[in-house]
Regions:
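Extracellular/periplasmic periplasmic-binding protein-like sensory domains
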Residues: 245-315, 326-329, 380-398
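Periplasmic-binding protein-like
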Residues: 41, 100-112, 132-134, 174-179, ...
Length: 398
């Protein structure tokens, strides 16, 4: 009898073991069963564009949660994010990218500064990794190589939006581009010459070093030029001083000023200049009405924040990476590239499309004005410009 009991117990034990082997007992989730995906996020945690970098990183975290349906996994693979600070320095960014690539990372994202993005792009090509540039706006990022994508807008889209503000009657008009001596600044000069110069305007630049903090000489030079239109293209912490210099010199009383709407902290610091400018806008959270933007607003509200200028760039980068990993079922770079080319999706700004021919991020833009005074200055949407109207020309891959 004891023998029969022992045999029966052994049989049950064997059957249980067989079922565990065949059925897997499934104590682990699908994400545990597949290798995780490592993403390197290289952006400006410090430096001139640190506030933009913070927005990008926060947007990426919210976008990753949104795109993975709160699981942090894509296609059953956990997404691990490693952050590196480039401080806006291309050399630091390239070193960080090479370090991560050397550790086996197949996906790099970030780049707050255009000069940084333009140096990481060739690293991505040489090492065959996926690179999704962030807030960096230089046109040369588009069409750089098939490994390089962007999650934000590009300068040409800014200038095309500005063109909808100034109209088509530019023949014989004088336009001055006021920009920093940087890749971003030069990209704006080039784009204005192409778009507004192509419409008949004469375009001249006035540029200031990135290190400048006294803008009176540049403001006076602009006033003396007597332009019909001034297009300031500025980024970073010195913007308030730049605007004050223009206002103090009386430029707003003598010329029409069109510029990009900067981050929210700039509204109050622009002083009396705020309501004197016509703004093209990449993004402000009151403009779009859609599910993705609602999710971004709600997630940041829980943190006591509201979305700012570059939160969507991080959000979209996460959407792109999740989509690429899901469609590739892993980190096959060729498959991830193919998955992103031509992809249309709903982003915080609205419907966006990655153009297959050069990886331009086609997206709507906005025209706005600032209302109020002091700490109560807020943007008001005047109109949304559909993506078809602000699509940049194709830049074939190198």
């Amino acid at each position: 009898l004891k023998v029969r009991h022992v045999l029966a117990a052994l049989a049950v034990s064997a059957l249980t073991a067989q079922l565990v082997t065949l059925g897997g007992a499934a104590p682990a989730s699908a994400a545990d069963a597949k290798a995780p995906v490592n993403v390197g996020l290289i952006y400006s945690k410090t430096g001139l564009l640190a506030s933009y970098g913070a927005q990008y990183a926060e947007g990426f975290a919210v976008g990753l949660d949104y795109a993975t349906n709160h699981t942090g996994a894509a296609g059953g693979r956990k997404i691990n994010v490693t952050e590196r600070d480039d401080a806006g320095d291309p050399a630091k960014a390239v070193a960080a990218a090479k370090e991560l690539v050397g550790q086996g990372y197949k996906i790099i994202a970030g780049s707050t500064a255009s000069g940084v993005a333009l140096q990481i792009a060739p690293v991505a090509k040489e090492n065959n990794v996926l690179f999704v540039s962030g807030a960096a706006a230089a046109d040369a990022i588009t069409g750089n190589n098939r490994n390089t994508f962007r999650s934000g807008r590009q300068t040409y889209q800014d200038v095309l939006t500005a063109g909808t503000i100034v109209g088509s009657n530019l023949r014989g008009k004088k336009v001055v581009v006021y920009a920093q001596e940087s890749a971003f600044g030069q990209a704006n000069v080039n784009a204005v010459r192409t778009v507004l110069g192509g419409a008949g305007a004469t375009v001249d630049p006035v540029t200031a070093p990135l290190s400048a903090n006294d803008f009176a000489p540049f403001s006076q030079k602009i006033k003396d030029a007597k332009p019909d239109l001034l297009f300031p293209a500025w980024a970073g912490a010195t913007a308030p001083a730049m605007w004050k210099g223009l206002d103090d010199s009386g430029v707003f009383a003598s010329t029409k000023v069109v510029s990009g709407l900067d981050q929210r902290s700039s509204y109050e610091t622009m002083g009396s200049a705020a309501t004197k400018i016509s703004f093209l806008s990449h993004y402000f959270y009151l403009a779009p009405k859609n599910k993705a933007n609602d999710a971004l607003v709600a997630a940041l509200k829980k943190q006591g924040k509201v979305p700012d200028l570059f939160h969507p760039d991080g959000f979209v980068a996460a959407q792109m990476i999740v989509h690429a990993v899901e469609k590739a079922d892993g980190e096959d770079v060729g498959k991830m590239i193919a998955a992103l080319e031509g992809w249309s999706f709903d982003a915080p700004k609205g419907k966006q499309t990655i153009r297959a021919a050069d990886h331009a991020m086609l997206q709507p833009m906005f025209v706005a004005k600032l209302e109020g005074s002091g700490s109560n200055v807020t943007p008001k949407l005047l109109r949304t410009i559909p993506l078809q109207a602000v699509s940049p020309p194709v830049r074939p891959f190198k």
